[in-house]
From Swiss-Prot:
Domain SH2: 6-104
Organism per entry: Homo sapiens
Superkingdom to which the source organism belongs: Eukaryota
Record's subunit section: Interacts with NTRK1, NTRK2 and NTRK3. Interacts with CD84, CD244, LY9, SLAMF1 and FYN.
Recorded name of the encoding gene: SH2D1A
Protein name stated in the entry: SH2 domain-containing protein 1A
Length: 128
């Protein structure tokens, strides 16, 4: 999971929400560890000023799935990156397609990116 750029590890729900709200962009998303269910992850998505959280888990056979809207057929993916790619498309059972990955930065240095926007020292937002 550490190889997934949007995975922030064991951050609190509040910290994840602050990171997403700081972007101000609907469709911004990140992955973090669930605080309440060990071994489960949370896919957090910003939409109209609210954070929507979807549980993501890995089956015993290694497949990945997300709990989406009721009535939406549960899909399984071989890799977490495939799950993220699928949810970048509309009508997948989440509030808005995943559009702007909020990546965890490896260095704590603030830089002037190629977009000319100063980046937060802990995250990097990439436009598609």
């Amino acid at each position: 999971m550490d190889a997934v750029a949007v995975y922030h590890g064991k951050i609190s729900r509040e910290t994840g929400e602050k990171l997403l709200l700081a972007t101000g962009l609907d469709g911004s998303y990140l992955l973090r560890d669930s605080e309440s269910v060990p071994g489960v992850y949370c896919l957090c998505v910003l939409y109209h000023g609210y954070i929507y959280t979807y549980r993501v888990s890995q089956t015993e056979t290694g497949s990945w799935s997300a709990e989406t809207a009721p009535g939406v057929h549960k899909r399984y993916f071989r890799k977490i990156k495939n799950l993220i790619s699928a949810f970048q498309k509309p009508d997948q059972g989440i509030v808005i397609p995943l559009q702007y990955p909020v990546e965890k930065k490896s260095s704590a240095r603030s830089t002037q990116g190629t977009t000319g926007i100063r980046e937060d020292p802990d995250v990097c937002l990439k436009a598609p």
